[in-house]
Curated annotation (Swiss-Prot):
Belongs to the aspartate/ornithine carbamoyltransferase superfamily. OTCase family. One of its GO terms (biological process) is arginine biosynthetic process via ornithine. Pathway: Amino-acid degradation; L-arginine degradation via ADI pathway; carbamoyl phosphate from L-arginine: step 2/2. The record marks 32 as: Important for structural integrity. InterPro entries: Asp/Orn_carbamoyltranf_P-bd (IPR006132), Asp/Orn_carbamoylTrfase (IPR006130), Asp/Orn_carbamoylTrfase_sf (IPR036901), Orn/put_carbamltrans (IPR002292). It is an enzyme of class 2 (transferase). It is found in: Cytoplasm. This is Ornithine carbamoyltransferase, catabolic. SUPFAM superfamilies: Aspartate/ornithine carbamoyltransferase. Carbamoyl phosphate binds at residues 57-61, 84. Its EC number is 2.1.3.3.
Length: 107
């Protein structure tokens, strides 16, 4: 079964079918196995990912950065001091602009 996730956000499990969730879990296990065996892969080669954090989070930031690099992506960390969410710029406007600039956004 071919899964189409492009253009979709993972906000809640209820937004996905059981088959889609099982696919995501199986694919995650596949990626973990490749990493464990030292098999290189670049599923996200050439993709740019914005990592937006409202609060500092060492483990979460490190996990997302490492995962993005392992997959061949280029992560860009944008912390609370780097962006003006809801201050000088509306959150909606910021999301639209970043959505055009990046292939994926972690928030």
């Amino acid at each position: 079964m071919t899964q189409v996730f492009q253009g979709r956000s993972f906000l809640a499990e209820k937004d996905f079918t059981r088959a889609e969730l099982e696919y995501l879990i199986d694919f995650s296990a596949h990626l973990k196995d490749l990493k464990k065996r030292g098999v290189p892969h670049h599923y996200l080669e050439g993709k740019n990912i914005a990592l937006l954090f409202e609060k500092t989070s060492t483990r979460t930031r490190a996990a997302f950065t490492t995962a993005a690099i392992d997959l061949g992506a280029h992560p860009e960390y944008l912390g609370a001091n780097d962006i003006q969410l809801g201050k000088k710029e509306s959150t909606e406007d910021t999301a639209k602009v970043l959505g055009r600039m990046f292939d994926g956004i972690e928030f």
